[in-house]
Amino acid sequence: MVETSTSLVKLEQDGSLFLPPGFRFHPTDAEVILSYLLQKFLNPSFTSLPIGEVDLNKCEPWDLPSKAKMGEKEWYFFSHKDMKYPTGMRTNRATKEGYWKATGKDREIFNLQPTSYGGSSNNKNNKQLVGMKKTLVFYMGRAPKGTKTNWVMHEFRLHANLHNDNPNLRLNLKDEWVVCKVFHKKGDDREAINKQQAQAAAVDQYSAGTPNNGSSVEAGDDDDDLFQLDSIIDPSIYFSNSSAANILSAPPNMSNSVVAANYGASTTTTGTASAGSFQQQPNYCSLINKSISSSNVSSWNNMPPPPPVAEGGVHGIGSSYSLQHQAAMVKALRDVIRLPNPLGMPQYKLDDAYLWDSS
């Protein structure tokens, strides 16, 4: 004898449904479509005791069990599909912490028609296609680099064939109700959560430690006036002869560097104590005096014009090209050729533009 509904089924004060031990809400796929989802389409105000209503885009999967009306391992919800774009047909499946990703093919749901003897038949002619079921898995993070979890959802939707038996049914893909069954497979999501937290921490650390690359020179760097000269100086600006300009393009400290005879540049021998070998380097002082004309040199640092040079030159260097400009050129090219004062030129004093340190 079946107990009365008042003693068998109780409605809790919070609206959840209470069933005695042993009773479960475990409908078939066809029952979900015909007994619940179809009724929601025919009457949007339809509610069901075992199926709640949520916005899946505003809830994380681990929060859904507390929002369900009933269920211990499986939870059912009505949900209104949210479109990703107002004019598109793609469904928005993202939440704050992750997203639902479809997996596999959609499965057809058939309703088995009753036979004359009261049972049901698997005969193809006795089956009616009533809905579709899509399987989705929740991923932590953002696509396409999300971390897979053990939260799974089955999404049930109506099939257009039901319109034949229900003339009042109106299907609109942009305004569609679905029933979602959410459950958690056996397993631990701590690995996925830890991986997601590690990725977030790595992004934060990278963002905090990345220097501002908007400028190659930081404010206040007094020694960076000539930064990366080998990449920003065009030697052809300062040499009237293109072949002479190519000298600056040669790798620094090359062994036995040879200067063409037509430049009249001699070579100086330098040695390295660690390697115990000697290298031939061009005498850039001779090269500058014989290959550079003052008309091809830019005025560096807007220096004042030099005083007249006496006939015969200054400091024994016979050239109309002033020592002041030569010293500025040497300083500029020192990082390029990577030689410490290779010309043996007197040091330029900053306090007086025309005084030289001859020591």
Curated annotation (Swiss-Prot):
<feature type="domain" description="NAC">
    <location>
        <begin position="19"/>
        <end position="185"/>
    </location>
</feature>
<protein>
    <recommendedName>
        <fullName>NAC domain-containing protein 45</fullName>
    </recommendedName>
</protein>
<keyword id="KW-0010">Activator</keyword>
<dbReference type="InterPro" id="IPR003441">
    <property type="entry name" value="NAC-dom"/>
</dbReference>
<dbReference type="GO" id="GO:0045893">
    <property type="term" value="P:positive regulation of DNA-templated transcription"/>
</dbReference>
<keyword id="KW-0804">Transcription</keyword>
<dbReference type="GO" id="GO:0009414">
    <property type="term" value="P:response to water deprivation"/>
</dbReference>
<keyword id="KW-0238">DNA-binding</keyword>
<comment type="function">
    <text>Transcription activator involved in responses to drought stress and salt stress. Transactivates the stress response genes LEA19 and PM19L.</text>
</comment>
<dbReference type="Pfam" id="PF02365">
    <property type="entry name" value="NAM"/>
</dbReference>
<keyword id="KW-0539">Nucleus</keyword>
<feature type="DNA-binding region">
    <location>
        <begin position="130"/>
        <end position="191"/>
    </location>
</feature>
<dbReference type="GO" id="GO:0003677">
    <property type="term" value="F:DNA binding"/>
</dbReference>
<dbReference type="GO" id="GO:0005634">
    <property type="term" value="C:nucleus"/>
</dbReference>
<dbReference type="GO" id="GO:0009651">
    <property type="term" value="P:response to salt stress"/>
</dbReference>
<keyword id="KW-0346">Stress response</keyword>
<keyword id="KW-0805">Transcription regulation</keyword>
<dbReference type="InterPro" id="IPR036093">
    <property type="entry name" value="NAC_dom_sf"/>
</dbReference>
